[in-house]
């Protein structure tokens, strides 16, 4: 029996660039893949005639939805899915996309299809990546990703560039325990209104990416990276402030960022619609020193704080099938 295990990372997205056909970068932006938190999923054919899913209540529903979508294209038998670790949804970590791509890849393997290395085909199968491609490409490649946005024509390939993040760097993740970011109908409504950034803002963000963020990663200049990331995140946040309330979506996170910046800690940026943020660190010791400055509770709101490593590879695949190499990376 084909038994497949897939372990994904999670992703940070530092804000969509809402360009136009003239400015480019429509739904482009930058983000990074993280080793933690992660999805760890096993899948094999069921011994019964119905699917069996072992996961939290919300994840069980999500997996069932993905399987329904996949079966519109793929003749998938009844399967058993066990989810052993989860990424929180609507927290800015790309949990839904990573789960969907993992289920799509595992379903193809269980159905004896080996073509799992094209992330856009997996996204189409799971009906994900409606706008951003960072989590999609990151699923297979990892790293820091520069998404140039939707191509001008359907025949063009989406341009997503990947660079390696210094392995010593870390990201401190902070999120309010009981809050979620904008999602669902509200998110679709916002983008259906054809939200467009001013040409000057698009140009400024692109310069920040090309002249500051990318060179600072490639040359491992951490201080430059953290300041550039803060500037980029603030500029994008101001564009979305009317919808989410301010540069940072959650009032407690806003207060926390003020405290951190007053202490000389730079780089705090919201991921996607939040409410979670990340703060870059140059090492595990630096990350721990940042964590030590973050209270477990602020203004009555409990904060979840974690330290995450960059993930410079794609999701990992393990299989008991002799046809697949154990520990294979989706790169």
Language-model region placement:
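Conserved glycine-rich beta-strand-loop-beta hairpin in the small C-terminal domain of fold type I
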Residues: 275
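Claisen-condensing/thiolase-fold acyl-transfer catalytic domains that form or cleave C-C bonds
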Residues: 269
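Short, basic/glycine-rich phosphate-binding loops at helix/coil junctions
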Residues: 47-49, 103, 232-238
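DPxDG-like acidic metal-binding loop motif
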Residues: 93-117, 138-149
């Amino acid at each position: 029996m084909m038994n497949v295990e897939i372990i994904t990372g999670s992703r940070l997205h530092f804000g969509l660039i809402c360009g136009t056909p003239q400015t480019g970068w429509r739904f482009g932006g930058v983000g990074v893949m993280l080793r933690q938190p992660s999805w760890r999923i096993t899948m094999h054919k069921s011994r019964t005639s119905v699917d069996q899913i072992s996961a939290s209540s919300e994840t069980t529903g999500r997996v069932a939805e993905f399987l329904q979508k996949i079966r519109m294209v793929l003749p998938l038998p009844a399967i058993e899915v066990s989810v052993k670790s989860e990424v929180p949804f609507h927290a800015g970590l790309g949990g839904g996309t990573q789960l969907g791509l993992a289920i799509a890849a595992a379903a193809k393997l269980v159905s004896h299809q080996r073509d799992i290395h094209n992330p856009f085909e997996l996204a189409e199968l799971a009906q994900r990546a409606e706008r951003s491609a960072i989590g999609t490409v990151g699923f297979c490649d990892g790293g820091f990703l520069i998404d140039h946005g939707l191509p001008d024509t359907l025949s063009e390939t989406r341009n997503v560039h990947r660079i390696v993040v210094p392995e010593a760097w870390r990201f401190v993740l902070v999120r309010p325990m009981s809050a979620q970011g904008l999602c669902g109908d509200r998110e679709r409504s916002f983008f259906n209104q054809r939200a467009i950034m001013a040409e000057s803002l698009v140009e400024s963000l692109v310069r920040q990416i090309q002249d500051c963020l990318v060179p600072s990663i490639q040359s491992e200049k951490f201080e430059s990276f953290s300041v550039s990331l803060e500037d980029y995140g603030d500029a994008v946040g101001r564009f979305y402030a009317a919808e989410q309330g301010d540069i940072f979506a959650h009032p407690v996170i806003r207060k926390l960022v003020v405290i951190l910046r007053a202490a000389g800690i730079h780089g705090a940026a919201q991921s996607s619609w939040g409410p979670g943020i990340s703060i870059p660190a140059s090492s595990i010791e630096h990350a721990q020193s940042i964590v030590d400055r973050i209270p477990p509770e602020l203004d009555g709101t409990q904060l979840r704080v974690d330290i995450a490593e960059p993930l410079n590879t794609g999701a990992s695949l393990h299989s008991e099938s002799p046809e697949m190499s154990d520990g294979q990376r989706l790169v």
